[in-house]
Amino acid sequence: MARRAGFSLLAVTVFVVSAAGFAWHNIQSRITWFDIDSILSENDRPGTKPPDSYDGRAVNLLVLGTDSRAGDNNVDGSQGDDEVSVARSDTALVVHISADRKRIDAVSIPRDTLVDIPSCKTLDGNSTGAEEDGQFNSAFANGAGSGSDKKAVASGAACTLKTVEKMTNIRIDDFIVIDFNGLSKVVDSLGGVHVQVDEAIDDPDYTGFKLDEGCQKLDGQAALQYARVRHGVGDGSDISRISRQQKLMSAMASKALSSNVLTQSGFLTSTLETLTTSERIGQIGNLSGLAYSVQGVGIDKINFITMPNEAAADENRVIPTEGAKKVWKALEQDKPVSADAAAPATTDAPATADDSATSEEQNAEDAGVEPAATQAPATQSPKAGASPQQPATKPTASACPA
């Protein structure tokens, strides 16, 4: 039987809960959740349609990875100074689960994207100032302030949620935050994961991380370094790092879903203790119910997509393109997003065409997104620091052994 190897870390989290009904009461106490409705102004948010339930409607989740490197999180050679010791969001995904539970799209938002960040309330009663053309991951930092505890993380997630809604006009139902130190523990609880490394990594100046090209087995610390590294590989951009993070997520999900770890208390504990969530999805019954509802999603109906973007005037920043608007509109309307149309070709070797090309072009047409074949080629190369966006990743069985 084919394994659903392409689920993101979100999907791993969802599925472990559905496998753990026998331990609900014990597990519930391990998830930290906050009610952020009190600090989100309903007047400033896109509308939602009743009933206020996951049943029978599309679900939009914001999944964030935090990047505090203080204390136990400082496992990759960084110094844990003020710049990295406070809570920061290094990874952001808008995960759309279709109303019919037959399709999942996960859209990565580059942290260096320039966006308008609204004023945000925090759980400690303060408010932050609005920013025009702020760096996307500053939204999380604004909400979290100088803190790195769970309450600061929840406030950071709330401000990021408001920023995403302002940029996309999509109502975000819930958030899930996964800390990077937790990522290391989850990989270790899996016994490590295999990743196909396309280009050797050598970062002597910043983290000291080295990784050879080819199929490599990563333990928790190596996986964390692989997910974080920007120097000593490729063009050093956040866009190329997103591609590596997506590959690692798929490898983790593949390992979890192809073994019996989903029912092992060590894996459940290490996974769930890494989470900070909004109130509804932090309740085991709701999380488990969502898990059961997506069990029938086919491997060919799960897409990782990088938000279409281009270089900004500042060569170290990117801005959303018109293609990004089409992607967000497709999700808002609960329509398929063409993998090819969502993100043009990169400098990597192109994927081989398959029999689904015609149907994907039709899906793109339905979603209001032009198929890749009709898009005009770029007239110039991207500026330094802003690599071409990565194509959507179709989950496939890895040639790297599990």
Enumerate the language-model features and the residues they cover.
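Non-catalytic, solvent-exposed segments at the cell envelope interface
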Residues: 1-402
